[in-house]
Amino acid sequence: MNKFSSVWVFSDTPSRLPELMSGAQAVGEKVNAFVLNEADSATACHLGADHVWLLSGKPEDRMIEDYAAAMAETIRQHSEGGAVLLPNTRRGKLLAAKLGYRLSAAVSNDASDVSLQDGKAAVKHMVYGGLAIGAETIASPFAVITLSSGTFDAQQPDASRSGEMHTVQWQAPATAVTRTATQARQSNSVDLDKARLVVSVGRGIGSKENISLAEALCQTIGAELACSRPVAENEKWMEHERYVGISNLMLKPELYLAVGISGQIQHMVGANGAQTIFAINKDKNAPIFQYADFGIVGDALKILPALTAALAR
């Protein structure tokens, strides 16, 4: 497989770093990682970074993405081309845009596949709501790419690995957003990417209060709770970070238990990587049953308590 001579990685979300590092090693010869603190420096080395660049000196009232100027200058000084891999988080995409401008590079978001073909970056991602795969070839020397969750398997750390350490000093941008206050968001977010068992609820659960039935099942079998996009975005019953689908989480658990989820393609793109899909839906014609390995047609409000009781024995 052809590889980029140099790949640069940064993740604003620590849980996404192992996957990004795995991707960087799969497509790059030399792996560089930008990090925000000393602890992340060691982690990046153990995950396979050849060079670790510690971002330092940012004032407390400035945003992480304001490191873009210093990052771009570092990338230009130490490579003539290559790929920059970021998570497809909100901050990841904002930083991608800033780096793309400063590196005169094309930016591709939500990539599900990255490779080097004929000396150019080849990127694939979902289009038309998950109904098709779009393929792009990036002609610019640098390619800035945000990766969808689950594109690569997470890299396992190796404490025996080491890399060369560097420091990148803060450069104040000409214009910047200044943070005037910070308020912690109330969230019970969990790293669903690593969950072995996932119970996911859709609007078929009926109400926010009924989600407690799925939570009880999760506690019984040691699963994590997820949801469909309408539950998070429309009904506001659960956090945005928990919804599965093309524009958010792409999961690959051993078991995905879909409760009251119709099974539209936009959702299933994020769930179809599961080893086993189990569906509960009162509509026997729901699309979810076309994807499910096992299914029950019936009222989830009756089935969930019975299933929880049976599995608790």
UniProtKB/Swiss-Prot annotation:
FAD binds at residues 255-283. Keywords: Electron transport, FAD, Flavoprotein, Transport. One of its GO terms (molecular function) is flavin adenine dinucleotide binding. Gene3D superfamilies: HUPs, TPP-binding domain. InterPro entries: DHS-like_NAD/FAD-binding_dom (IPR029035), ETF_a/b_N (IPR014730), ETF_a/FixB (IPR001308), ETF_asu_C (IPR014731), ETF_asu_C_CS (IPR018206), FixB (IPR023461), Rossmann-like_a/b/a_fold (IPR014729). Pathway: Amine and polyamine metabolism; carnitine metabolism. One of its GO terms (biological process) is carnitine metabolic process. Coiled coil: none annotated. The keyword Flavoprotein applies. Belongs to the ETF alpha-subunit/FixB family. PANTHER family: ELECTRON TRANSFER FLAVOPROTEIN ALPHA, PROTEIN FIXB-RELATED. NCBIfam families: PRK03363.1. Required for anaerobic carnitine reduction. May bring reductant to CaiA. Heterodimer of FixA and FixB. HAMAP family: FixB. This is Protein FixB. It comes from Salmonella typhimurium (strain LT2 / SGSC1412 / ATCC 700720). The gene is fixB.
